[in-house]
Amino acid sequence: MTLFSDSARLHPGEINSLVAHTKPVWWSLHTDAHEIWCRDSDRGTSLGRSIPCPPALCSVRKIHLRPQVLRPTSPRNISPISNPVSGLFLLCSPTSLTIPQPLSPFNLGATLQSLPSLNFNSFHSLVETKETCFIREPKTPAPVTDWEGSLPLVFNHCRDASLISRFRPRRDACLGPSPLAASPAFLGQGQVPLNPFSFTLSGKSRFSGAGASTPQPLLLHP
């Protein structure tokens, strides 16, 4: 999950190095949902389309973190959270990404190497939680992630592995409304769908060389 960045050009060797230094104790992922979300601004959101998406569409892979496998303590002595967190992988590219089963840091690295045409600068990783707060504007409510809730706690556990992320809201024409809006099975009864926000991985000094841009600071409003 934490291998993708829109601010650094990653080569297979760098990916392997990053995978090798990623500790599965908190990185463990599993794919509860296998849908591929493709959205066209004219036709709305479609579910279950696993075909390669043309540039006008977005291919989104939904996976889930297992917070219970996070480290029991972090540098700030933060306990693991119990709230589920979902990760959304957004690939704005003609190529669809197929994640093998079961997902692990090792076969994910192999998957990335098998996609030499993948442009990492157009690959954005999205994170959502079920905890939301709302900023109401004159026209419509704008749901945003509750940044004081579960999400920062997850990534605080990653600080010692040099994988801390900097978050920022992202406005992208190909996103439109949240693709989770049509997924009551994921949201649960009475849950409110979120607008996705992208984050840029800084990886401390690992990707701070040539070709990397400085991530934008965290913004708490659209």
Swiss-Prot record:
It is found in: Nucleus. The keyword Nucleus applies. Keywords: Nucleus. Expressed only in fetal ovary and in undifferentiated ES cells. Its main location: nucleus. Induction: Down-regulated during differentiation of ES cells. GO terms for cellular component: nucleus. It comes from the Eukaryota. This is Embryonic stem cell-related gene protein. It comes from Homo sapiens.
